[in-house]
């Protein structure tokens, strides 16, 4: 114990020990800019200076999407857990428990239904923070359930993708979700219901090779990485240097792979306009 401990009263010492919250300031990965967390939250986690789009939680994204932030949580069917009894450094079941506790979600896909400028829509959000948003049986079932709900309600289906690809711990059962979700997309198409994909950072692997690139309209957030294999793998395969910005949203837009790149602040209005055009339904703002 030093002399300060003897001189400074206990109440003052407890005030001095009060810690600053860990997330009070957030550093931009692109520019290094420090942003006050509340300012970042108010700006939908887009860094004001650099325009870098950070990850947005499913709850925050849904609250921003639906009218007045009001929506209906849609249940998802239970899927078999760990059919292969997979284990690497730790058991797959232990990994699931860990991520469920961390994210307070059963898996990486969240479903919701509600109104977007007065129009009924069904939405799905992939959460990259849950096992890198990987596509497994639970995620596949959730996406198919969302599309089926859109069919039953005759509503547009919007999905926000964020994934590292198929979930390796589920092997062939994970890969099966690619054709299964593709069939569900085809059912939407046959019913003449809009299917809009919003590609967020990153969207890669088996997700890109299936439902993420089968939309009627493909939108991407600025700077999003979108592709199948990583650039290093491609360069080693073709033995050539890839162009600057390869697999970024802006590069894909300029080469006709996606339809538009939209700032997060403008996403809600853009989606409402597209749903209105595709369903020939006036928006609430237009009706007023």
From Swiss-Prot:
Q: Which domain of life is it from?
A: Bacteria
- If you read the UniProt record, what top EC class would you report for this enzyme, in one word? transferase
Q: Does the keyword Hydrolase apply?
A: no
> What SUPFAM superfamilies does the record point to?
ClpP/crotonase
Main localization of the protein? Answer: cytoplasm
A Pfam family per the record: Carboxyl_trans
Q: Which InterPro entries does the entry link to?
A: AcCoA_carboxyl_beta (IPR034733), Acetyl_CoA_COase_Trfase_b_su (IPR000438), ClpP/crotonase-like_dom_sf (IPR029045), COA_CT_N (IPR011762)
Query: Where is this gene product found?
Result: Cytoplasm
Q: Annotated pathway, please?
A: Lipid metabolism; malonyl-CoA biosynthesis; malonyl-CoA from acetyl-CoA: step 1/1
A single Gene Ontology molecular function, please? carboxyl- or carbamoyltransferase activity
- Report the catalytic activity: N(6)-carboxybiotinyl-L-lysyl-[protein] + acetyl-CoA = N(6)-biotinyl-L-lysyl-[protein] + malonyl-CoA
Task: Tell me which EC number(s) this protein carries.
Answer: 2.1.3.15
Record's keyword annotation contains Lipid metabolism: yes
Q: Quaternary form?
A: Acetyl-CoA carboxylase is a heterohexamer composed of biotin carboxyl carrier protein (AccB), biotin carboxylase (AccC) and two subunits each of ACCase subunit alpha (AccA) and ACCase subunit beta (AccD).
Q: Which family does it belong to?
A: Belongs to the AccD/PCCB family.
What name appears for this protein in its UniProt entry?
Acetyl-coenzyme A carboxylase carboxyl transferase subunit beta
């Amino acid at each position: 114990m030093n002399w300060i401990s003897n001189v400074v009263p206990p109440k003052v010492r407890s005030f001095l020990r009060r810690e600053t919250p860990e997330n009070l300031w957030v550093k931009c990965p692109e520019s290094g800019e420090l942003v006050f967390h509340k300012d970042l939250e108010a700006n939908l986690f887009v860094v004001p200076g650099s325009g870098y789009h950070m990850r947005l939680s499913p709850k925050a994204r849904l609250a921003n999407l639906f009218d007045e932030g009001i929506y209906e949580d849609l249940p998802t069917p239970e899927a078999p857990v760990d059919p292969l009894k997979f284990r690497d450094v730790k058991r797959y079941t232990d990994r699931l428990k860990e991520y469920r506790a961390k994210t307070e979600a059963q898996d990486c896909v969240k479903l919701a239904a509600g109104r977007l400028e007065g129009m009924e829509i069904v939405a799905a959000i992939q959460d990259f923070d849950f096992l890198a948003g990987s596509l497994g049986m639970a995620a596949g079932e959730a996406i198919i359930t969302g599309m089926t709900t859109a069919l039953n309600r005759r509503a547009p289906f919007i999905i926000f993708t964020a994934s590292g690809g198929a979930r390796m711990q589920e092997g062939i059962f994970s890969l099966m979700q690619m054709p299964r979700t593709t069939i569900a997309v085809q059912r939407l198409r046959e019913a003449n219901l809009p299917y809009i994909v919003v590609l967020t950072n990153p969207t890669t692997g088996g997700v890109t090779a299936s439902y993420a690139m089968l939309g009627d309209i493909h939108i991407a957030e600025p700077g999003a990485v979108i592709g199948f294999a990583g650039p290093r793998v491609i360069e080693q395969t073709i033995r050539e240097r890839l162009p600057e910005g390869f697999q970024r949203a802006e590069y894909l837009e300029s080469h006709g792979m996606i339809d538009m790149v939209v700032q997060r602040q403008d996403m809600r209005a853009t989606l409402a306009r597209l749903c209105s055009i595709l369903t020939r339904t006036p928006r609430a703002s237009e009706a007023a």
